[in-house]
Amino acid sequence: MTNQLKPWHFKQLPLQKRTGGEIFSCLFISDSSKIATLLESPYPNNLNNPQLTRYSICAGSPRVIDGVEQMWTPQLGEVQDVLNRLLARKLNKTTDFNSSPYLPFTGGWLGWLGYDVAWETETLPKLKTDNLPFPVAFWYEPECFAVLDHWEQVLWLAASNKSELDELEEKIYQQKLDLSDDTSIISDAIPSLKLITSQADYEAAVLQAKKYIQAGDIFQTNLSIRFETQTDASGWEIYLALQKINPSPFASYFKTPWGE
């Protein structure tokens, strides 16, 4: 782990009603890197609370400092220690940022913390097996990123050096961004789905949740069912199709070495 923090260079462009998915597709999804991130708020904006869907954030591959990719996947039991060291590094280092705007993300780390991180602070029974390849914790510092201000219709580009910033701007002006007609994987054919959770197990979980609520142990729970199927579509194509069929008030897409 390196202690060096590099500055960012920012550039402001008109957004022109482009979506997070359009900017992400133009700048980062075609990148040869195995890592890219999209945190997207949709149009139209929430008229009553426009700040709730004001920003989208997208980013590409990790920064490389002193030959080391700025990416972390600590094991369970080490997550909080690694986070504390990273935060201490950031707080103890003053960096002269180049025209850093007031935005929800001005450089730092993108990724996730899985529910299993709770095992670092509580002693809980492990009742379920996790057969997915994704690490319980993953985050990285991107080499470049974009922040979309849907409210002010401003696109902020950020990169580690000015030449990369110019390359991002050139991509924006050269490539077609419209994804509105990309419905190639939406069809009337319904693929067969294999449910990982049985109906009986799901109904039993619902009844158990009701008991917890009645006892005052919890006031809310979110139950889910995992299923799988076979498709030739990429994870990004599936994301676009789902956003078209049923837009979410907030959505995310991660391209990682372990899957999408």
Report residues per predicted region.
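Extended alpha-helical targeting/anchoring segments
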Residues: 1-260
